[in-house]
């Protein structure tokens, strides 16, 4: 009898665990993307300026346009001044009622003195939203010692993917804390959710972004500051090398609008409903099977990239 009661109890516990897992999945997918209305972002920000790093291409540029559409003044930070000027011109042609400023900065420069100079420029305005988007990836997946670009590229990936969200957050948080309002969005990647073979440094740095953001949420949860992780899957951008959009692959503009709509409604998400669906389904797969699937995909991507590289070499 005691054994039977134990088995019945264990069965109820298992059912409860399954029900909780399914509820969490549906909540993560439907909550921020279907059921919950977007918050008043300007009110949550508490200031009229938004800073976007990596703002001249891809997701960062799309964030800048979307924030401008919502009435924020935008301060664009990227490496090349000519591209910053062009992006500024494009934004003002579409949203002439806002102000746009630029700051050229090479994020491969890890010197604290360089960051102090950049922060001095940024803190000239009241920053309500900080989008830490700038990032760098591999040219194509490969094992560590064969990564295209060698140790210089590995160093740059590590520097660009980890220092900006750390140091810019640290340098801008004081004014947000003083106002008891502000929004920080750290753009990571779904690659940080898994131990991605052939993407070792990229995957590891994106895991860093995820952990950093989660810890900052704990540190500032009573300061009126919203700190969010956005970890997208595939978006049609220059860095992803994907040109065509699809049901699972939005362009930057569609993604940025969707992602900003989730601010304040979820603290850690992919930013797009079909990306979230993919993530939740992948999480149901046992780790050893998931690792095998992801590794096979990376091996295929590498093979295609090497074939393309070989064709280009022959055509020269």
UniProtKB/Swiss-Prot annotation:
NADP(+) binds at residues 47-76, 106, 206. GO terms for molecular function: 17-beta-hydroxysteroid dehydrogenase (NADP+) activity; long-chain-fatty-acyl-CoA reductase activity; testosterone dehydrogenase [NAD(P)+] activity; very-long-chain 3-oxoacyl-CoA reductase activity. PROSITE patterns: ADH_SHORT (PS00061). Its EC number is 1.1.1.330, 1.1.1.-. GO terms for biological process: androgen metabolic process; developmental process; establishment or maintenance of epithelial cell apical/basal polarity; estrogen metabolic process; fatty acid elongation; hormone metabolic process; long-chain fatty acid biosynthetic process; molting cycle, collagen and cuticulin-based cuticle. Substrate binds at residue 189. It holds the Pfam family adh_short. It is an enzyme of class 1 (oxidoreductase). This is Very-long-chain 3-oxooacyl-coA reductase let-767. The lineage of its organism: Eukaryota, Metazoa, Ecdysozoa, Nematoda, Chromadorea. The gene is let-767.
């Amino acid at each position: 009898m005691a054994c039977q009661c134990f088995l019945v109890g264990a069965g109820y516990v298992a059912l409860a665990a399954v029900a909780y897992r399914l509820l969490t999945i549906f909540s993560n997918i439907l909550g921020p993307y279907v059921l919950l209305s977007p918050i008043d972002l300007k009110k949550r920000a508490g200031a009229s300026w938004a800073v976007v790093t990596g703002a001249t291409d891809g997701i960062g540029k799309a964030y800048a346009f979307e924030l401008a559409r919502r009435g924020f003044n935008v301060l664009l930070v990227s490496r090349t001044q000519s591209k910053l000027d062009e992006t500024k011109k494009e934004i003002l042609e579409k949203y002439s009622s806002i102000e746009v400023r630029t700051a050229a900065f090479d994020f491969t420069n890890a010197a604290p003195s360089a960051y102090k100079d950049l922060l001095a420029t940024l803190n000239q305005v009241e920053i309500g939203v900080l989008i830490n988007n700038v990032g760098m990836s591999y040219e194509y997946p490969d094992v560590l010692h064969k990564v295209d670009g060698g140790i210089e590229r590995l160093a740059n990936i590590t520097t660009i993917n980890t220092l900006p969200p750390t140091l810019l957050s640290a340098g801008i948080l004081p004014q947000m804390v003083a106002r008891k309002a502000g929004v920080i969005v750290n753009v990571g990647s779904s690659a940080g959710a898994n131990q991605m073979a052939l993407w070792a440094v990229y995957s590891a740095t994106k895991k860093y972004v995820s952990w950093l953001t989660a810890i900052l949420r704990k540190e500032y949860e009573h300061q009126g500051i919203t700190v969010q992780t956005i970890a997208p899957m595939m978006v049609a951008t220059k860095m992803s090398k994907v040109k065509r959009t699809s049901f699972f692959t939005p362009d930057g503009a569609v993604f940025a609008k969707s992602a900003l709509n989730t601010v304040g409604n979820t603290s850690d998400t992919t930013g797009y409903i079909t990306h979230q669906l993919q993530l939740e389904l992948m999480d149901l797969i046992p780790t050893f099977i998931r690792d095998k699937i992801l590794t096979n995909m990376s091996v295929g991507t590498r093979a295609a990239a090497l074939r393309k590289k070989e064709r280009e070499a022959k055509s020269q």
